[in-house]
Amino acid sequence: MTLKICVAQLNFTVGDMSGNAQKIISASKTAYAQGARLVLTPELSICGYPAEDLLLRPAFIAACDDALNTVATELASLKDLAVVVGHPTGSDSRTKSVAVQRRYNAASVLCEGRRLETYAKRELPNYQVFDERRYFTPGQGVCVFQVQGINVGLLICEDAWFDEPGHLAKDAGAELLAVINASPYHVGKGGERIERMRQGALNTGLPLIYAHNVGAQDEVVFDGASFVLGADGALAGQASSFAEELWFLEANRPETGVEPAQS
């Protein structure tokens, strides 16, 4: 069995939830028409990255949720299509009768109008241009979902720079790791990413898809160059640098391997 996957390496605009949702819908419909049954969008694709203090506004989180629902509704008729969308989410709780708002850097798996799974990023970077601990609470869960018989483990960016999240996904049954990202560029960063993800693939014994953002926000630049690694850590293929692209891959069973789709 072959699963065709589309990495939607696109430029999402901070604060334009409606426009970002339409971009995801359009890309997903195009990918579906070309045979893809799994679409991966970057980290926080619904609102753009980094959204910074906009994330502190309840109305902003609500607008993100509305946009996510729009994506789910518009793609509901596409049978068996799973779309991974990065988004912020919030939940209210009470501690000693005091209301506490917790926000998460999350990703949801949308399929036929429903949210099959929602995963919250476990590892929150707080260095250099990152200040995610200001906005988000670390997640504690694991997300493994099935598409056409293949169990996909979902990670978000910094999760893949640590060993534990990948191992937890494998222990939960993952046969393939899908990592959605918004990783700022600097000279040499591409090689650093590949080397760290190679260690993740080797440590888990699983192939790994690195789905990246492209474009810029203020002084932060995202270089695209999404890639896929085999379970042996070998680079199997890479998308364009500094350009939007719908990049297609194929995952094959019974022994799960992933490589660029043949055009």
Predicted feature descriptions by range:
Residues 1-263:
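Enzyme catalytic cores with a strong preference for nitrogen-chemistry domains
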